[in-house]
Design a protein with these regions (language model features):
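Short, small-residue-biased leader/transition segments that mark boundaries at the very start
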Residues: 1-7
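Bacterial N-terminal signal peptides
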Residues: 8-13
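Boundary of Sec targeting at the N-terminus
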Residues: 18-19
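N-terminal accessory beta-strand-rich subdomains and adjacent acidic, glycine-rich linkers
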Residues: 22-213
Protein backbone atom coordinates (compact mmCIF):
# COMPACT_ATOMS: atom_id res chain seq x y z
CA UNK A 1 0.00 0.00 0.00
CA UNK A 2 1.34 3.41 -0.85
CA UNK A 3 0.20 7.00 -0.76
CA UNK A 4 1.30 9.55 -3.35
CA UNK A 5 1.85 13.20 -2.50
CA UNK A 6 2.44 15.99 -5.04
CA UNK A 7 3.48 19.64 -4.77
CA UNK A 8 2.14 20.87 -8.09
CA UNK A 9 3.49 24.42 -8.17
CA UNK A 10 7.07 23.10 -8.09
CA UNK A 11 6.35 19.95 -10.10
CA UNK A 12 7.80 17.84 -7.32
CA UNK A 13 6.27 14.44 -6.73
CA UNK A 14 7.26 11.79 -4.22
CA UNK A 15 5.81 8.61 -2.78
CA UNK A 16 5.52 7.48 0.83
CA UNK A 17 5.34 3.71 1.17
CA UNK A 18 3.79 1.96 4.14
CA UNK A 19 4.84 -1.61 4.74
CA UNK A 20 2.13 -3.91 6.09
CA UNK A 21 2.39 -7.54 7.14
CA UNK A 22 -0.25 -9.93 8.42
CA UNK A 23 -0.21 -12.98 10.65
CA UNK A 24 -3.22 -15.22 11.29
CA UNK A 25 -4.21 -17.79 13.89
CA UNK A 26 -4.09 -21.46 12.83
CA UNK A 27 -7.85 -21.43 12.14
CA UNK A 28 -7.55 -18.12 10.25
CA UNK A 29 -10.13 -16.27 12.36
CA UNK A 30 -7.76 -13.93 14.24
CA UNK A 31 -5.66 -11.66 12.01
CA UNK A 32 -2.98 -9.24 13.23
CA UNK A 33 -1.76 -6.52 10.85
CA UNK A 34 1.62 -4.90 11.54
CA UNK A 35 2.48 -1.58 9.87
CA UNK A 36 5.01 1.26 9.74
CA UNK A 37 2.70 3.92 8.30
CA UNK A 38 4.28 7.39 8.58
CA UNK A 39 7.25 5.80 10.36
CA UNK A 40 5.06 4.77 13.31
CA UNK A 41 5.17 1.07 14.25
CA UNK A 42 1.63 -0.14 14.85
CA UNK A 43 -0.63 -3.19 14.89
CA UNK A 44 -4.33 -3.96 14.75
CA UNK A 45 -6.33 -7.11 15.46
CA UNK A 46 -9.51 -8.47 13.93
CA UNK A 47 -11.61 -11.55 14.65
CA UNK A 48 -13.76 -12.93 11.83
CA UNK A 49 -13.09 -9.66 9.94
CA UNK A 50 -14.44 -7.59 12.87
CA UNK A 51 -12.04 -5.09 14.51
CA UNK A 52 -11.25 -5.90 18.14
CA UNK A 53 -8.12 -3.75 18.52
CA UNK A 54 -7.93 -0.70 16.27
CA UNK A 55 -4.60 0.61 14.97
CA UNK A 56 -2.41 0.92 18.09
CA UNK A 57 1.16 2.10 18.49
CA UNK A 58 4.22 -0.03 19.12
CA UNK A 59 7.69 1.09 20.15
CA UNK A 60 10.16 1.84 22.92
CA UNK A 61 11.84 5.03 24.10
CA UNK A 62 15.23 4.23 25.63
CA UNK A 63 18.32 5.99 26.89
CA UNK A 64 20.02 5.30 23.55
CA UNK A 65 17.23 6.50 21.28
CA UNK A 66 13.56 7.02 20.53
CA UNK A 67 12.42 3.88 18.76
CA UNK A 68 8.74 4.75 18.64
CA UNK A 69 8.89 6.84 15.45
CA UNK A 70 10.84 7.17 12.20
CA UNK A 71 10.96 3.37 12.04
CA UNK A 72 10.81 1.04 9.04
CA UNK A 73 9.30 -2.43 8.93
CA UNK A 74 11.64 -4.78 7.08
CA UNK A 75 10.34 -6.90 4.20
CA UNK A 76 11.56 -10.28 5.43
CA UNK A 77 9.44 -12.04 8.05
CA UNK A 78 10.40 -15.20 9.91
CA UNK A 79 7.29 -17.29 10.48
CA UNK A 80 6.81 -20.67 12.13
CA UNK A 81 4.18 -22.91 13.68
CA UNK A 82 4.27 -23.49 17.43
CA UNK A 83 2.92 -26.80 18.75
CA UNK A 84 3.61 -27.40 22.44
CA UNK A 85 2.16 -29.54 25.20
CA UNK A 86 2.87 -28.82 28.84
CA UNK A 87 1.53 -29.57 32.32
CA UNK A 88 1.02 -27.22 35.27
CA UNK A 89 -0.42 -28.63 38.49
CA UNK A 90 -1.91 -25.40 39.86
CA UNK A 91 -4.16 -24.15 37.05
CA UNK A 92 -7.73 -25.03 36.08
CA UNK A 93 -6.61 -26.96 32.99
CA UNK A 94 -3.48 -28.82 34.01
CA UNK A 95 -2.70 -30.34 30.59
CA UNK A 96 -2.35 -27.71 27.89
CA UNK A 97 -1.91 -28.20 24.15
CA UNK A 98 -0.81 -24.85 22.70
CA UNK A 99 -0.85 -24.32 18.93
CA UNK A 100 -0.03 -20.93 17.42
CA UNK A 101 1.51 -19.08 14.50
CA UNK A 102 4.66 -17.07 15.27
CA UNK A 103 5.95 -14.16 13.23
CA UNK A 104 9.12 -12.12 13.80
CA UNK A 105 8.80 -8.53 12.53
CA UNK A 106 12.01 -6.54 12.36
CA UNK A 107 12.04 -2.75 12.65
CA UNK A 108 14.98 -0.56 11.64
CA UNK A 109 15.87 3.11 11.99
CA UNK A 110 18.21 4.90 9.59
CA UNK A 111 19.27 1.53 8.17
CA UNK A 112 20.14 -0.01 11.55
CA UNK A 113 18.32 -3.00 12.98
CA UNK A 114 16.70 -1.86 16.26
CA UNK A 115 14.27 -4.50 17.50
CA UNK A 116 12.04 -7.40 16.59
CA UNK A 117 8.39 -7.52 17.59
CA UNK A 118 7.59 -11.21 17.97
CA UNK A 119 3.90 -12.07 17.67
CA UNK A 120 2.26 -15.37 18.57
CA UNK A 121 -1.35 -15.85 17.49
CA UNK A 122 -3.36 -18.87 18.61
CA UNK A 123 -7.04 -19.59 17.96
CA UNK A 124 -8.00 -17.74 21.14
CA UNK A 125 -5.33 -15.13 21.93
CA UNK A 126 -2.52 -12.86 20.75
CA UNK A 127 0.79 -12.29 22.52
CA UNK A 128 3.81 -10.22 21.54
CA UNK A 129 7.17 -9.12 22.89
CA UNK A 130 10.14 -6.96 21.91
CA UNK A 131 13.67 -8.17 21.26
CA UNK A 132 16.26 -5.38 21.23
CA UNK A 133 19.45 -5.55 19.16
CA UNK A 134 22.82 -4.32 20.53
CA UNK A 135 23.83 -0.90 19.20
CA UNK A 136 27.58 -0.66 18.55
CA UNK A 137 29.28 -1.17 21.92
CA UNK A 138 26.04 -0.78 23.89
CA UNK A 139 24.91 -4.22 25.03
CA UNK A 140 22.08 -3.07 27.29
CA UNK A 141 19.75 -0.11 27.55
CA UNK A 142 17.21 1.46 29.88
CA UNK A 143 13.60 1.51 28.68
CA UNK A 144 12.40 4.96 29.75
CA UNK A 145 8.96 4.72 28.19
CA UNK A 146 6.93 2.14 26.28
CA UNK A 147 4.80 3.38 23.39
CA UNK A 148 2.70 0.22 23.19
CA UNK A 149 -1.00 1.04 23.25
CA UNK A 150 -4.34 -0.74 22.99
CA UNK A 151 -7.03 1.19 21.12
CA UNK A 152 -10.46 -0.35 21.58
CA UNK A 153 -13.28 0.02 19.03
CA UNK A 154 -15.79 2.82 19.58
CA UNK A 155 -18.61 1.79 21.87
CA UNK A 156 -16.53 -0.69 23.88
CA UNK A 157 -17.33 -0.83 27.59
CA UNK A 158 -15.11 -1.71 30.54
CA UNK A 159 -14.95 -4.02 33.55
CA UNK A 160 -11.86 -2.52 35.23
CA UNK A 161 -10.52 -2.47 38.79
CA UNK A 162 -9.14 0.99 39.68
CA UNK A 163 -5.56 0.97 40.92
CA UNK A 164 -5.32 1.86 44.63
CA UNK A 165 -3.25 4.80 45.76
CA UNK A 166 0.11 3.67 47.18
CA UNK A 167 0.93 3.21 50.87
CA UNK A 168 -2.68 2.78 52.01
CA UNK A 169 -4.92 -0.02 53.25
CA UNK A 170 -3.94 -2.64 55.84
CA UNK A 171 -0.38 -2.09 57.07
CA UNK A 172 0.05 0.41 54.23
CA UNK A 173 0.36 -2.44 51.74
CA UNK A 174 -1.79 -0.97 48.95
CA UNK A 175 -1.99 -1.59 46.10
CA UNK A 176 -2.35 -5.23 47.12
CA UNK A 177 -6.05 -6.08 46.90
CA UNK A 178 -8.72 -6.18 44.24
CA UNK A 179 -10.93 -3.10 44.16
CA UNK A 180 -14.61 -2.77 43.19
CA UNK A 181 -15.42 -2.35 39.52
CA UNK A 182 -18.41 -1.09 37.57
CA UNK A 183 -19.84 -3.38 34.90
CA UNK A 184 -20.12 -2.01 31.36
CA UNK A 185 -18.60 1.33 32.35
CA UNK A 186 -17.75 3.92 29.71
CA UNK A 187 -14.28 4.26 28.22
CA UNK A 188 -12.04 7.27 28.84
CA UNK A 189 -11.99 7.33 32.62
CA UNK A 190 -9.03 7.09 35.01
CA UNK A 191 -10.44 5.19 37.98
CA UNK A 192 -9.24 6.81 41.20
CA UNK A 193 -6.56 8.80 39.40
CA UNK A 194 -4.00 5.97 39.37
CA UNK A 195 -5.13 4.07 36.28
CA UNK A 196 -6.31 0.47 36.37
CA UNK A 197 -5.00 -2.94 37.41
CA UNK A 198 -4.32 -5.71 34.91
CA UNK A 199 -5.94 -7.89 33.71
CA UNK A 200 -8.37 -5.53 31.97
CA UNK A 201 -11.67 -6.79 30.58
CA UNK A 202 -13.62 -5.04 27.82
CA UNK A 203 -16.83 -5.79 25.94
CA UNK A 204 -16.84 -5.08 22.20
CA UNK A 205 -20.60 -4.53 22.04
CA UNK A 206 -22.40 -7.71 21.01
CA UNK A 207 -19.37 -8.87 19.03
CA UNK A 208 -17.35 -10.38 21.87
CA UNK A 209 -14.92 -9.77 24.74
CA UNK A 210 -11.32 -8.55 24.99
CA UNK A 211 -9.03 -9.40 27.92
CA UNK A 212 -5.70 -7.55 28.09
CA UNK A 213 -3.17 -8.88 30.60
Amino acid sequence: RQRQMCIRDRLICFTIKAEEKQIASPDGKIVVTISDKNGQPSYRISYKDTPFINSSSLGLITNIGDFSREMSLEHDVQSSRIDETYTLPNIKQSNVHYVATEGVYRFSQEGKMIYDVIFRVSDRDVAFKYKMYPQKNTLSCIVKEEATSFVLPDGSTTFLCPQSKPMGGFARTSPSYETPYKADDAMGKNGWGEGYTFPCLFRNGDKGWILIS
